[in-house]
Amino acid sequence: MQVLVRDNNVDQALRALKKKMQREGIFREMKMRDFYEKPSQKRAREKAEAVRRVRKLARKRAQREGIVAR
């Protein structure tokens, strides 16, 4: 990953790098790799994440269509 440093402005470059890393999901991956995750736990987590994603999409679609379901 590469970030340009303009006018020796290191703070701005660090902010840009952090934003890029956040977008790429590097921080989340580092947190996940901190400890070993058993394959069965990984499958369960991924399945739960998929369910969460589907529900979130359905909520957004319903809200867009004017149907508010809670």
Curated annotation (Swiss-Prot):
Organism: Rhizobium meliloti (strain 1021) (Ensifer meliloti)
Family annotation (Gene3D superfamilies): Ribosomal protein S8
Designated name of the protein: Small ribosomal subunit protein bS21B
The keyword Cytoplasm belongs to this UniProt entry's keyword annotation: no
GO biological process, one term: translation
Stored Pfam families: Ribosomal_S21
Keyword entries, A-Z: Ribonucleoprotein, Ribosomal protein
Lineage per the UniProt record: Bacteria, Pseudomonadati, Pseudomonadota, Alphaproteobacteria, Hyphomicrobiales
Family of the protein in this entry: Belongs to the bacterial ribosomal protein bS21 family.
MF annotations from Gene Ontology: structural constituent of ribosome
PANTHER family: MITOCHONDRIAL 28S RIBOSOMAL PROTEIN S21, SMALL RIBOSOMAL SUBUNIT PROTEIN BS21M
